[in-house]
Amino acid sequence: WWADDLKAQNAIEFAHNKGLKVASVTWPVTAGAKGDWVIPEIWPQRGEDPDTVFLPYSSPDAIEIYKRHKNTLFDFSNPFYPDVFATLCSVDIIKEKKPDLFFLHLSALDTLRHKKGAEIEKMDEALDFLDDKIGEILDAMEESGTLNEYTFFFLGDHGQLNIDKEFGINRVLKDMGYIIDNKNWKIMAH
């Protein structure tokens, strides 16, 4: 989650330090990153006050936008609620701030595939949902007069295959004597 865990300067801070107005919404490893409007990818647990997670690690100029939409963070009836929040925040930043560079991570499909595997029943639903969210962002750019000022990169962070069997590597390492307990180990997989 934490930007200060990175060993090199991230693209958000690099661009910000070069004088660009930079926004980032739910982009990985941005908690505490230096940018103009940063709302990090850091998720509160069920029942946890989202302010304790977001406020200390968002940029000061993004907090008002976060507060407008934080009520969407716990709509557990919608499996894609993090992307609803991210899109609402993104639309406001685009319309009100008009950043030079914008990073946005929509995670609906990735989250489903991590939980259910590559061949999921809800894949079409997730793709339709993401298509709608991208449409909302493009509409905001068009309304703000910035649509033709941006170049878009749509990325996936990894491929994925279905898992047929699991392998407990820490069990093997423990059996080999490399792990005694969680505090006494020579090798441990995470």
Where are these regions (language model features)?
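Secreted, luminal/periplasmic, and some membrane-associated catalytic domains
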Residues: 1, 121, 136-190
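His/Asp/Glu-rich, glycine-adjacent segments
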Residues: 1-117
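Catalytic-core regions built around general acid/base machinery
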Residues: 11-14, 126-129, 133-145
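Active-site-proximal segments of metal-dependent phosphoesterases and phosphodiesterases across multiple
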Residues: 115-131
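Glycine-rich loops and low-complexity Gly/Arg-rich segments
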Residues: 47-51, 127-130, 177-180
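N-terminal start-of-chain detector that recognizes signal peptides
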Residues: 73-77, 125-127, 167-171
